Design a protein with these regions (language model features):
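Conserved alpha-helical substructure of the radical SAM core
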Residues: 3, 7-92, 96-107
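Core AdoMet radical
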Residues: 40, 60-69, 83-98, 109-127, ...
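Generic structural signal for well-ordered alpha-helices
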Residues: 41, 77, 105, 132, ...
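Short cysteine clusters
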Residues: 49, 53-56, 266, 281, ...
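Short loop/turn motifs at secondary-structure junctions
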Residues: 52, 84, 111, 138-139, ...
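Radical SAM enzyme [4Fe-4S]-AdoMet core and its adjacent flexible, acidic
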Residues: 150-266
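Short, acidic, Ser/Thr-enriched surface-loop or helix-capping motifs
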Residues: 272-273
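Flexible mid-to-C-terminal extensions adjoining Fe-S/redox cofactors in radical SAM and related proteins
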Residues: 277-327
C-alpha cells in the first residue's frame, strides 16, 4: 500500500457509501451515546505543521493559517480556570509551532494535575531546547506519533527523513528523563496502521515496540496506544482515490464493538478549536460537527459539558468503536 505524495480532501457532500449510518446503527441496537463526567479539556492550537502526514484527519501542514491567537487563548485559559479539568491535552497540527505555546503551558500547569502535549518528533529534533526544558520543568506528559518500526512504512506516512529524526528525538527525550524507568516524566507513543486495516493488538504492539526500540536504539517509553486511522482528512482522500473508502468503512462497521462505548474519549473529553469553539472530540472538529450541533464559544460557558448531554456522531465514529476501540 502506498499513500499519495500529497492529498487534499475534496469539497462537497459526502458519498453514499451504502452502509448503515452510525447514528442509525446505535438506534437499532437501542444505544445512545451521551456524556459521562467530562474530565479532560483538549485544546487544538491550530493546523500549522512542518509535515503533511498522509493519515492526518485535519490535513495539517506548513501552508495552514488556522492558528490560535492570544485573545482566544486567554478565553481558553479562563475556561480552564473556571472548570478545573483533571487533564488538559494540547494538540494540533504541531502545537509547538504556535508561538504562544510557552505562555500557555506556564498558565495551564497550575490549573490541572495532568498537562499533556502531542508534539511532532521531527520538530523536537530541531533545536527547541527551551521548549523541552519547559516541558520537563512542568512535568508535561509527552505523547508522540511513531506509527511503525519499519523505516519505509513510517516515511510513507510521515515523509522522507522522518524515521531517523523521530528516533533521534525519542533518544533526546530519554536523555531528559522522559520515558526512562524510575522517572516521573512520562513519554507515550501512538501507533497506527500504515495500510487500510485495523491495528494489531495494543498489548502485542507495545511489547514489540518496547523490545525493538530498546534493543536497537536504547529507547524507552511508558505506554503505547494502537489507534485506528479515522476516515477523515488526507486518509479519507487516499481511501477515495484508491477505491477503498466503501470497503474501509464497511470493515469498521462490521467490527463495531458495543463494549467500546463505555470508554470512548468523547464521553469524558471536550475539544476546543483554534478559534475557540467547542466539539465533542478532535475528530468531530475535523468533521465540522460542533458540540450540541451548534457553535458554542468557550467564553460562553463556565463548566464542563453536563453528564447525559448528547454527543454529535457521524460515520467516522465507526473508527472509534471498531474492535478494541479508540479511547
Amino acid at each position: 500500500m502506498n499513500f499519495p505524495v500529497q492529498a487534499t480532501v475534496p469539497k462537497g457532500p459526502e458519498r453514499d457509501l451504502e452502509i448503515v449510518p452510525f447514528s442509525s446503527h446505535l438506534a437499532r441496537l437501542g444505544l445512545r451515546l451521551t456524556r459521562q463526567t467530562t474530565t479532560t479539556l483538549q485544546i487544538n492550537l491550530g493546523l500549522l505543521c512542518n509535515q503533511r502526514c498522509l493519515h492526518c484527519h485535519h490535513e495539517a501542514g506548513p501552508d495552514r493559517r488556522e492558528v490560535m491567537d492570544l485573545r482566544t487563548m486567554e478565553d481558553v485559559i479562563l475556561y480552564a480556570g473556571r472548570a478545573r479539568f483533571q487533564a488538559i491535552d494540547l494538540t494540533g497540527g504541531a502545537p509547538e509551532m504556535n508561538p504562544l505555546l510557552p505562555n500557555l503551558i506556564q498558565r495551564l500547569s497550575p490549573l490541572t494535575p495532568r498537562l499533556m502535549i502531542r508534539p511532532n518528533l521531527t520538530l523536537l529534533n530541531q533545536g527547541n531546547e527551551d521548549l523541552l526544558g519547559l516541558l520537563k520543568r512542568h512535568r508535561v506528559v509527552v505523547l508522540v506519533s511513531f506509527p511503525s518500526l519499519d523505516k519505509k512504512e513510517l516515511e510513507i506516512q510521515r515523509g522522507k527523513g522522518a524515521f531517523p529524526e523521530s528516533v533521534a528525538a525519542l533518544k533526546r527525550l530519554n536523555d531528559l528523563g522522559f520515558g526512562r524507568k524510575g522517572s516521573d516524566l512520562e513519554l507515550n507513543l501512538i501507533s497506527n496502521p500504515t495500510e487500510a486495516c485495523l491495528p494489531k493488538s495494543q498489548e502485542q504492539e507495545e511489547k514489540r515496540f518496547r523490545q525493538e526500540l530498546k534493543n536497537r536504539w536504547n529507547v524507552e517509553f511508558n505506554r503505547l496506544f494502537a489507534f485506528t486511522n479515522v476516515p477523515l482528512g488526507r486518509f479519507q482522500h487516499w481511501l477515495s482515490q484508491s477505491g477503498q473508502e466503501e470497503n474501509y468503512l464497511r470493515m469498521l462497521a462490521q467490527n463495531f464493538n458495543p463494549s467500546t462505548l463505555e470508554g470512548l474519549m468523547c464521553r469524558s473529553l471536550v475539544s476546543v478549536s483554534w478559534d475557540g469553539y467547542l466539539y465533542d472530540c478532535d475528530f468531530n472538529l475535523a468533521g465540522n460537527l460542533p458540540m450540541g450541533h451548534r457553535r458554542i464559544h468557550v467564553s460562553e460557558i463556565d463548566a464542563p459539558p453536563a453528564p447525559g448531554s448528547s454527543i454529535a456522531v457521524s460515520d467516522h465514529c465507526y473508527a472509534c468503536t471498531a474492535r478494541s476501540g479508540f479511547t
